[in-house]
Amino acid sequence: LGDVYKRQNMNSVPGVDMSTGSLGQGISCATGMAKAAKYLHRDDVRVYALLGDGEIEEGEVWEAFLFAAKYKLDNLCVIIDLNGLQIDGPTSEVMPTDPVDAKMRDFGFRTVTIDGHDFAQIEDAFQYFHTQTGAPTAVLMNTTKGKGVSYMENQVGWHGKAPNDEEYKIAMDELNAQLAELEAQV
């Protein structure tokens, strides 16, 4: 991660203008960026915000959703990772937010619910976003936390923890084996 604060460096990935934490500030920034692009008549600008299902428990997030819908920010795509786990446990026990799709529609979003591990569905969802006008889009991705690494899958303890060297090797071996299987199918 490269610095004393162990955060993502937003300057290392082109197009990633900021990274925030789990308290929901990112979506407020994203709606501001989308509104600014509209104000400046920058029809070429698309803003993407990635949130987790634990993060959408924050009130600030829902205020930003209301703002995005009120101003018809059709240049905003909100991607919500619905894996059912957060650092404190299952989202259904900590602060249930289901049904997210109905709530997003009620807040004025177009919604698409997909398998967040299916690349074809992800591509289709983003194509859908690019063809819609008049309202923001929410792509709801049903996922499995730690997918592809046997000892991490659906384990809340891995939410904010890095693997040690031995665990890292096991994880990379498992992921590389899956990659080889996929490449053999092509």
PLM features per residue range, with description:
Residues L1-Y5:
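Short, small-residue-biased leader/transition segments that mark boundaries at the very start
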Residues Q8-V186:
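Glycine-rich ThDP/TPP pyrophosphate-binding loop and its adjacent helix/strand module
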